[in-house]
């Protein structure tokens, strides 16, 4: 969904160095999807799906959160991850459309694998990523073990982060 706010609140570039010592709100779902769509099996005959452990469980999200969070902490940045809660009713049509696109991509992915078209399979794999409730729980457990705070919004994480930024001297990214 999203909103185009550039006319009323233009983006401002900043360096990570400038954020040292500050609490920074980070959209956990956006971050997770970055990891799930980039840290994938891209070997010549890879299926394009997220990296997995020996039992076939996806681990791209954990590897990504661990590395990025450790890097931020080493730079003196205090991350606060904000997870989305329940989607608002207003977003129901958009969520249904996303599900339909994901199902269509899953069918193409399966056909591409069966046909040995690994390039197409990898392209489609990026479109079928799903940050499951189990993956969210694993991420939150990892953050707990790292001593990094996180919150789950009542609805949209971006809105929660904006409120936190206004009330808690949190910089929202």
Question: What are the language-model segments listed below?
Answer:
Residues 3-8, 19-156, 160-164:
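Noncatalytic, basic helical substrate-engagement surface that gates or grips nucleic-acid strands
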Residues 165-169:
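Short, surface-exposed basic-aromatic patches at helix termini and helix-loop junctions that form
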Residues 8-14:
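A short, compositionally biased domain-edge/stem linker segment
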Residues 171-173:
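Conserved small/polar residues in nucleotide/adenosyl-binding loops
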């Amino acid at each position: 969904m999203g909103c185009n706010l550039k006319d009323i609140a233009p983006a401002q570039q900043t360096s990570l160095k400038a954020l040292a010592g500050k609490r920074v709100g980070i959209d956990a779902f956006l971050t997770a999807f970055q990891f799930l769509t980039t840290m994938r099996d891209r070997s010549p005959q890879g299926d394009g799906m997220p990296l997995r452990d020996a039992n076939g469980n996806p681990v791209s999200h954990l590897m990504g959160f661990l590395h990025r969070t450790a890097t931020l902490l080493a730079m003196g940045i205090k991350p606060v991850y904000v997870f989305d809660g329940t989607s608002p009713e207003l977003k129901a049509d958009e969520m249904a459309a996303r599900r339909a696109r994901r199902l269509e991509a899953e069918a193409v992915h399966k056909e591409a694998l069966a046909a040995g078209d690994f390039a197409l399979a990898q392209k489609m794999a990026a479109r079928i990523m799903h940050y499951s409730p189990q993956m969210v729980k694993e991420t939150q457990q990892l953050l707990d073990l790292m001593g990094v705070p996180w919150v789950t919004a009542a609805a949209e994480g971006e809105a929660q982060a904006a409120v936190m930024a206004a009330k808690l001297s949190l910089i929202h990214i």
